[in-house]
Amino acid sequence: MFRGASAINLDTKGRVAIPKRYREPLHVEYNSQLVITVDIQSACLLLYPLDEWSKIEAKLLLLSDTLPAERAMKRMLLGYAHECELDGNGRLLLPLPLRQYANLGKRAMLVGQLNKFELWDETAWQHQIEQSRETIQDEEFAENIRLADFSL
């Protein structure tokens, strides 16, 4: 399981070094194979271990090719999906279209989300954190039935 936020840098070739604490689990449990795609609700990327991505693909197979919303979701997630492997130095090469989608600059944030990572431009991540704080204070958040029994 992946958790925590790590500041990382993109090099001039568009590579990111995955923090060391994640490299061994990714190598041992997932053979260093990942799939990177776009987040359809935020300007960030999603990095899935290949086994986890396979579960997403199984769900996508069940969606319609004729219903516009389902077709659009499939196009985005699958159209941008890129298989990759950590190199010997624990780096991933991010294809240019993915970097452009997430507006990634030199400084980025890799954020663990249990079964996947989000990859954000650092400034966009800070903005997202502020938006999340506002959302948590919103009445709609307090009325969310799925969150009613959630406590820390």
UniProtKB/Swiss-Prot annotation:
| Superkingdom of this protein's organism | Bacteria
Fetch the InterPro entries from UniProt. Answer: MraZ, MraZ_C, MraZ_dom, MraZ_N, MraZ_sf, SpoVT-AbrB_dom, SpoVT-AbrB_sf
User: Where is it mainly found?
Assistant: cytoplasm
Quick check: keyword DNA-binding in the entry? yes
Give an example GO biological process.
Answer: negative regulation of DNA-templated transcription initiation
Q: Which GO terms describe its cellular component?
A: cytoplasm; nucleoid
- Occurrences of domain SpoVT-AbrB (ranges): 5-52, 81-124
Compartments where located: Cytoplasm, Nucleoid
Molecular function (GO) terms for this protein are: DNA-binding transcription factor activity; transcription cis-regulatory region binding
PROSITE patterns in alphabetical order: SPOVT_ABRB
Is Zinc included in the keywords of this UniProt record?
A: no
For this UniProt record, give its keywords in alphabetical order, as a comma-separated list: Cytoplasm, DNA-binding, Repeat, Transcription, Transcription regulation
Q: Which family does it belong to?
A: Belongs to the MraZ family.
Subunit organization: Forms oligomers.
Q: What is this protein's name?
A: Transcriptional regulator MraZ
